[in-house]
């Protein structure tokens, strides 16, 4: 997590939380009409399964076996479409709730056939693509999609699309008549199907058992036809397809199944997006309760995209929904993820989604939903709310967690919690950028503080349904004063009194009570809150958000090299990456008056445009505990630093031991030198002998090189 220089507050005036209104002078992270496509930290995202939201145009509903009138069969289309979302944008339901971004189902054309199962399952969810360059006609036309984007932007709402380049649709290796045989089309022209795949557009390695990372990448996910991203046609097709949707004006992408695609290819995809028109991109890497995966952290830190924060979502569900953990476990997760993720503020948080049971339980206490939303909206990360959560919708498992939207009541307590805290999130940078500090804790009570410079938000939550707790000995960074609850007592929060030394007068926190107290003040020195994107090339534009930059142009440095300033305001700077060598750099801002911010670290400068190359080495025998890695003379291969070598390589699916392989994002059109090394669990390195391998990487396509281990 980004660290900033703590500022000592010496004011002794009495402040009230109503001073939050002074934030309007700052111009929040998003200015009206200037949607920030690379920073979502102050946003509230609302996830919509398009087919299950609103049927705004009955004329585009499918017929026959694809459709379920009245949505009695939840595995078929029910009629929701882009016009329905437009209607709810224009009637104020989303804007009044405080939604500033929507994440919608994959918009591409899906299969028109149904599965031969008990339900006759259809592609309503959008994950069974047949043509990534055409719209799903049951959601609307391309013109309808453009109207949706325009309507959202007119109301200050960003649009995120789901995108699932891992696969097409269900297919069978032995039965070409099964559904649509996974066929892939390019704007209406057939490229190929899963059987008789002479061009090798797909993988044919059987279904994954989820036994290893390699197994999940190079085998089929269930019965879905797994795309071969190293195929030059597939590589170019998918990259062109995503740029087509970017041309429609989208602001973000949720990348499906990132755990199941080659990391190297995905980094080259992110480079393609950043080269073209950067948008906030986050991937889906499912983690179960209490699961910690180092590969998950590595991907988030090295791929150029963020992730859905399953560690956050699962832990909050354990604490407030399932009672299988307590606030100590949650606080530990907050600390651990702050260390594990370089950009923890960019990870997308949630309490439920379309792949898990809804948070609200049939016959359960809606107060738990309210508490969970309050924590979600005041915690680090980009908060995402699943459609209908604000209406206390229930449903365990697919498809019961994807029912038709039940109602649009603006008076539910959950709706009002979102409304109030979305406003606070937009207007107090502590929620967008602040560190998190635990201030008071027991199994039932969690008091935590978010702080960014002088901006402070203090939150207290009591999950118990029966116990009252006296909160004594609490200290805060809030200046001395009286603070009213930002929720207006909606969850029974009260006023607190803060002394001159930061001590909070004792108060009671009742069962199910949540209190939120806030303070904000103008910064006089520069403080960086966010940089996006965090990967680029020399000349790429980068947006720096924060406070106290001043109105006169100052200096931005990548390491010790000054960048060309494109635009400068007190809260946002746009610069071009200076002419520096490839590598990772700290960014600093110096105001025109000479004051310098703390460093914002780990911006990655790539060598040039990236392509995905498969490196294969034969006859690389190893001892127990050893793995093969690749290292070379370019930054993307570690610059001969064995601690930065790429690997471990794979040896089970596409090739078998003692042949090893890995797909790596490398600079295009460049003659590179490399070698393979053996590493054991203690980090001991054995180099292959002989001369360096030499390879000239391709341009604008994928590549492959096969060599023998040199003994």
UniProtKB/Swiss-Prot annotation:
The keyword Disulfide bond applies. Ca(2+) 1 binds at residues 55, 57, 60-61, 79, 81. May consist of two protein domains: the one in the N-terminal side cleaves the alpha-1,4-glucosidic bond in starch, and the other in the C-terminal side catalyzes other activities, including the reconstitution of an alpha-1,4-glucosidic linkage for cyclizing the maltooligosaccharide produced. Residues 607-711 are annotated as: E. GO terms for cellular component: extracellular region. Its cofactor is Ca(2+). Residues 434-522 are annotated as: C. Residues 32-165 are annotated as: A1. InterPro entries: A-amylase/branching_C (IPR006048), A-amylase_C (IPR031319), Alpha_amylase (IPR006046), Carb-bd-like_fold (IPR013784), CBM20 (IPR002044), Glyco_hydro_13_cat_dom (IPR006047), Glyco_hydro_b (IPR013780), Glycoside_hydrolase_SF (IPR017853). Substrate binds at residues 127-128, 167, 220-223, 254, 259-260, 354, 398, 402. The keyword Disulfide bond applies. The gene is cgt. The active site is at 256 (nucleophile), 284 (proton donor). The record marks 355 as: Transition state stabilizer. This is Cyclomaltodextrin glucanotransferase. GO terms for molecular function: alpha-amylase activity; cyclomaltodextrin glucanotransferase activity; metal ion binding; starch binding. Disulfide bonds join 71-78. It comes from the Bacteria. Monomer.
